Amino acid sequence: MAATAFLVLTYLLGAFPFGLVVALVGRGIDPRLAGSRNTGATNVSRLCGTKLGVLTLVLDLAKGLVPVLCARAMTDSPVFLSMVAVAAVVGHMYSVFLYGKGGKGVATTIGVFLGGAPIPALLSVAVCVAVIRVSGYVSAGSLTLAVALPILCAWLGPVFLVPAAAIIGGLVIHKHRDNIARLRSGQEKSWRKDRAKAA
């Protein structure tokens, strides 16, 4: 009973649309109606500025980190910790508060694995940032992170999180299917161009 309640609370925390609230309160902009129409940190940053984008990133990351740390303090059950990890990300991606819609889950995924597998998480973030800097595309870095996480968990541990990392990575890739299509067609937006316009 307690485990079920915790999973529901984890989903609800993951589902809370911090990006929407930050954009509406900070700039009066609904990110669902502009830019990529996504409530995540990248779109909020493009629409509302870097500071509000970073705030959204931190809050979305916390949605994954806090439940996993709390779960680890409660139990060492690999199955339960894996379920908490997936619940947080699924909540962010398919929010009950947004009628089943949501973000792409990258920040929340990072938070989840910082709490459950910090070394693979940090290495995945490093690879993600490197790909973004080289390619100029945030989506390319996000996709790389989604692929790297289960591989690094399998290599460096904890191995019990590999299935959760694979499920979450697959969901992140699925959420980026439009970005993948734009990358293939050469129509994806580059953060370098966004910075040049802002300058």
Curated annotation (Swiss-Prot):
Subunit annotation: Probably interacts with PlsX.
Main location: membrane
Known pathway: Lipid metabolism; phospholipid metabolism
Reaction catalysis annotation: an acyl phosphate + sn-glycerol 3-phosphate = a 1-acyl-sn-glycero-3-phosphate + phosphate
Spans traversing the lipid bilayer: 5-25, 51-71, 79-99, 112-132, 153-173
Source organism, top-level taxon: Bacteria
This protein's GO CC annotations: plasma membrane
Pfam families the UniProt entry points to: G3P_acyltransf (PF02660)
Record's protein name: Glycerol-3-phosphate acyltransferase
Enzyme type, top EC level: transferase
Keywords noted in UniProt: Cell inner membrane, Cell membrane, Lipid biosynthesis, Lipid metabolism, Membrane, Phospholipid biosynthesis, Phospholipid metabolism, Transferase, Transmembrane, Transmembrane helix
Name of encoding gene: plsY
